[in-house]
């Protein structure tokens, strides 16, 4: 299933190598170029939404990021879009939760063992990895625990209709 761009292992590197070989041999590989461009767009999507809808009105929001692994069911953060996002917001109050990523690998932000503690009093919630436990978040409780009302959920982990009914500003990737 689609993620926030090509991440993890070596696929991104391999595609760039194939593209370089194709360019050296004057072979048109627009398809691979399109994949790489789409990946770049997806990797920056959360950042672009955060800039447009949050940072434009609140220069110092508190932000919860749920998920650092590049995909669910792994502890790998290699080339994870979350790391790029963390680098961009390292001067903000950032709360972080991931069920399996080693907290010692995280350079920025404050790691929380529980989802509830992570989301408490934040202005923005970003779900960067669609872990199963994030689907079980009690949205009414979320409404009471958060200070703000912005949800950035590229994977549609949460129930968008209920979030909107509760007064959240909900952003997801695609339609």
Set out the residue ranges of the language-model regions:
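Structural/interface elements that position substrates and couple domains in central-metabolism enzymes
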Residues: 1-175
């Amino acid at each position: 299933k689609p993620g926030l761009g090509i991440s993890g292992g070596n696929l991104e590197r391999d595609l760039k190598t194939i593209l370089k070989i194709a360019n050296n041999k004057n072979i048109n590989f627009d398809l691979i170029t399109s994949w790489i461009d789409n990946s770049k767009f997806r990797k920056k999507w959360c950042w672009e939404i955060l800039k447009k809808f949050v940072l434009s009105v609140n220069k110092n929001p508190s932000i919860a990021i749920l998920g650092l692994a590049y995909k669910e069911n792994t502890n790998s953060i290699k080339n994870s879009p979350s790391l790029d996002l963390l680098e961009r917001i390292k001067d903000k109050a950032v709360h972080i939760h991931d069920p399996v990523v080693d907290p010692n690998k995280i350079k920025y932000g404050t790691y929380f063992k529980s989802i509830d503690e992570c989301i408490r009093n934040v202005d923005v919630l970003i779900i960067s990895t669609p872990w199963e436990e994030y689907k079980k978040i009690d949205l009414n409780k979320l409404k009471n625990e958060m200070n703000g009302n912005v949800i950035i959920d590229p994977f549609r982990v949460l129930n968008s209709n209920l979030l909107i009914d509760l007064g959240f500003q909900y952003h997801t990737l695609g339609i």
